[in-house]
Amino acid sequence: MAKVGIAVIHGMGSQKKGFERPMVEELTNRLAKLGVGQSDVAWEPIYWANVTEPRQMEYFKDADRDGDLDWKKLRKFVLTALGDASGYRKTGDTKNDIYDAIHAIVGQALAQLSKQVSSPNATLIWIAHSLGGHIMSNYIYDTQKSVTAGKLKNKSKFERLETLRGILTFGCNIPLFTFAYRKSEVKPIKLPRGAVWDNYYDPDDVLGYPLKPISAAYNKTVRSDFSINSGGIATSWTPLSHNGYWTDNDFTKPAAQFIADIVNAAP
């Protein structure tokens, strides 16, 4: 069984099941060249768009029918992006809590991934795009809080995130959710000992940002912010570069090395 489990979570915007496959295929090929075999790594996607997208598309169809909207592609991008960001929050409404529904999906995915790795102490890597980075951060925070409170004793160390050794975020918009607090008050998650966090962003991507400037605490926690050029010729210089990271060489090449280093260090 695999030495390392890798969870891949998508971000804001319209997504489909299988979103991770092109990136996983490219990373698998790159890892093979670095001496990491397919059996060394297990992958598990975290697909949550089915929680938020139906309501968004219902509204879009009604609005387009009644208002004959222009710029449909751009409108869908903005609608799903902002809709995801605004919908993913604790509301106190137990009948319609998108936050908890998404976190339940994350937990189920990690439980599934734990079955594919060699032991409860296997190494975990988390790869997160866009809003997925914010979801990941909140899930880790909530999990660590539960562990501290003596809960989750029935979960493995892997599912309690105690074996987390690497985080890769790209097109991350965590900064957008920090402005309700003073800079000095903004604290990141506590990484387990030995874990590293690297972040990638495209300066043309208005939804992806460096993380170290958020606060002194983030500057200390995040190892590096890397500025790259993501997307193809038609999109790399536009805001649409937000969805261009997945198979872009500027991201997948260093990402493969990041994974290989952790795999080689794994017990």
Label for each model-derived stretch:
Residues 30, 34, 113, 146-150, ...:
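Solvent-exposed amphipathic alpha-helical surface segments
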Residues 12-15, 26-32, 37-120:
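Active-site catalytic motif of lipid deacylating hydrolases and related acyltransferases
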Residues 41-43, 124, 223:
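Short, conserved active-site loop motifs that form the nucleotide-linked donor/cofactor pocket
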Residues 6-26, 90-194:
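Serine-dependent carboxylesterase/thioesterase catalytic core
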